[in-house]
Amino acid sequence: MQNKRDSYNRDDLLASSQGELFGPGYPQLPAPNMLMMDRVTKMSETEGDFGKGLILAELDITPDLWFFDCHFPGDPVMPGCLGLDAMWQLVGFFLGWVGGKGKGRALGVGEVKFTGQILPTAKKVTYEIHMKRVVNRKLVMGLADGRVCVDGKEIYVAKDLKVGLFQDTSSF
């Protein structure tokens, strides 16, 4: 694997969406508009609540982001499912970062709670992912807890985020 660092900028994340950051066969992030972060500010294999890995990332909020026009007209708010998807994206990114290969797929979440919202007036969303477990067998899978904050206030909490890496997704 190439480019294993402890932080990544927007250009790096765009390279990941094209399969060019870690190399052929490693999981890719989605391309814009579904790429839900502008930078990864910290990657660690040993930190986090469980000592199994920590990912910190950020998304800059501007009123012209695509989802504010359609969700909802006259009442713009970032869809909560996009914040949840961002957490899955980061778990998959971590799996590639630690050497896992395959196509990333979200497998589920044990529990998710939304206690706030992301409005066009916000400045920054931060994501915090605490890896609980990485299984590296025939199926590479990550299990993590995550939280989303807007301008420093926690608004989403997810438990048991699951992402798998698949060599063949035809039967998935």
From Swiss-Prot:
One of its GO terms (cellular component) is cytoplasm. InterPro entries: FabA, FabA_FabZ, HotDog_dom_sf. The keyword Ion transport does not apply. Its EC number is 4.2.1.59, 5.3.3.14. One of its GO terms (biological process) is unsaturated fatty acid biosynthetic process. The keyword Hydrolase does not apply. Necessary for the introduction of cis unsaturation into fatty acids. Catalyzes the dehydration of (3R)-3-hydroxydecanoyl-ACP to E-(2)-decenoyl-ACP and then its isomerization to Z-(3)-decenoyl-ACP. Can catalyze the dehydratase reaction for beta-hydroxyacyl-ACPs with saturated chain lengths up to 16:0, being most active on intermediate chain length. Belongs to the thioester dehydratase family. FabA subfamily. Homodimer. This is 3-hydroxydecanoyl-[acyl-carrier-protein] dehydratase. It comes from Vibrio parahaemolyticus serotype O3:K6 (strain RIMD 2210633).
